Amino acid sequence: MRAREIDAIIKEQTEAFFKQEGFKYVKKSIGYVKKTKDYYINYGFVHYEYHPLYEYSITLFVQLTEVEKIYLKIRDGVTLGNTFVFKLSYFLGIEYWINNNPIWSIRTEGDIPAFSQALIDSYTKYVKDFIPFITQPKNMLNFLLEQIATGGIYANNENVFIRVLILMKLLNYPIEEIQKRLAEFKSKLAGYREDLKQVYYKQMDNVVAGNW
């Protein structure tokens, strides 16, 4: 089997359920999407190919539209990014979740129903109620700050720092608090290569000044 064949069968086995939940299957997004004026959700599956074996996993991509539009301008980008990507392992409370997402091995058509069921069950148990929570800017901000506090490399980088500053600006935090975070984030990037460091420093300064 090829990945496109597996994806088509997963769609066949799950589309009716997700349609009822307000999602639309989008092939290029690897799964199901839901869009409002405030956010864009992509809940679906990513895979690694070791033909004839494929390893599938479940992932939730969360894009807060206003945050990402500002970040796009700040970095002079081309496409909107994701405010954060949640792997199923996060919801399962797995230690070092960022690198330990559960995997479903698919080699034959008979392996697919178990993954399709997991996609539905995980949504019902974890993701459905999480979406209205995490798409609130204040909750996303608190989540990102918690992740930064863990010291994890995945959360201590310019992408997360700049999004935190954007959220603080949008939520009208006192400028003193924002500047305190700015100083903290700049110190965390102090070891970066000089040219990159100056780019990120300028981007963060522009966010704090509202230059977008």
Predicted features along the sequence, with ranges:
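Intrinsically disordered, low-complexity regulatory regions enriched in serine/threonine/proline
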Residues: 2-7, 33-212
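Long, charged, glycine-rich C-terminal linkers/tails
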Residues: 26-33
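Amphipathic alpha-helical segments
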Residues: 3-26
